[in-house]
């Protein structure tokens, strides 16, 4: 779910951007998105949105509200705990990949809270 995703971002990005700073970033972070992603951070969010779209095709799966378990270890090491529930596994994997992607992407504060009507066509 989105709350766990926020914690996972915090786990992966220790001493970096807080999760809330990704909620209104670029064309895809924190919103459905359209147009060309503004940078690598935004591309991570676009891919995450697409992953959630695929997860939503699993009967009964609601990715934004599906709780899962993961373990945050030392450093920025974290893993999804496998479940018998396919939806939970897929959603955790979506969030895991996005958190890793965000770790490797350079955050540009100029892309926070941009005018999507101008920049996201």
UniProtKB/Swiss-Prot annotation:
Pfam families linked: Phospholip_A2_1 (PF00068)
Domain of life of the source: Eukaryota
Molecular function in Gene Ontology: calcium ion binding; calcium-dependent phospholipase A2 activity; phospholipid binding; toxin activity
Annotated tissue distribution: Expressed by the venom gland.
Keyword list, A-Z: Disulfide bond, Neurotoxin, Presynaptic neurotoxin, Secreted, Toxin
SUPFAM superfamilies: Phospholipase A2, PLA2
Gene3D superfamilies (UniProt xref): Phospholipase A2 domain (1.20.90.10)
Chief place of localization: secreted
Cellular compartment(s): Secreted
One annotated Gene Ontology cellular component of this protein: extracellular region
Gene Ontology biological-process entries: arachidonate secretion; lipid catabolic process; phospholipid metabolic process
Statement: the UniProt record of this protein carries the keyword DNA damage: no
Disulphide linkage map: 11-72, 27-120, 29-45, 44-101, 51-94, 61-87, 80-92
PROSITE patterns, per the entry: PA2_ASP, PA2_HIS
CDD domains, A to Z: PLA2c
UniProt-listed InterPro entries: PLipase_A2, PLipase_A2_Asp_AS, PLipase_A2_dom, PLipase_A2_dom_sf, PLipase_A2_His_AS
Family: Belongs to the phospholipase A2 family. Group I subfamily. N49 sub-subfamily.
Its job: Snake venom oligomeric phospholipase A2 that has potent presynaptic neurotoxicity. Chain B is not itself neurotoxic, but it is essential for the neurotoxicity of textilotoxin. Subunit B possesses a very low phospholipase activity.
Subunit structure: Heterohexamer. 2 forms exist: 2 A or 2 B chains, 2 C chains and 2 covalently-linked D chains, and 1 A or 1 B, 1 C, 2 covalently-linked D chains and 2 differentially glycosylated covalently-linked D chains. Textilotoxin was originally described as pentameric.
Name recorded for this polypeptide: Basic phospholipase A2 homolog textilotoxin B chain
Organism: Pseudonaja textilis
């Amino acid at each position: 779910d989105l709350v766990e995703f926020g914690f996972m971002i915090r786990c992966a990005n220790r001493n970096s951007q807080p999760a809330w700073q990704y909620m209104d970033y670029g064309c895809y972070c924190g919103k459905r998105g359209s147009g060309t992603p503004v940078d690598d951070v935004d591309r991570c969010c676009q891919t995450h949105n697409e992953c959630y779209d695929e997860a939503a095709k699993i009967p009964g799966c609601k990715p934004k509200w599906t709780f899962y378990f993961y373990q945050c270890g030392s450093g920025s090491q974290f893993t999804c705990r496998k479940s018998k529930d396919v939806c939970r596994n897929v959603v955790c994997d979506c969030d895991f990949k996005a958190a890793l992607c965000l770790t490797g992407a350079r955050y540009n504060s100029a892309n926070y809270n941009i005018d999507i009507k101008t920049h996201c066509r």
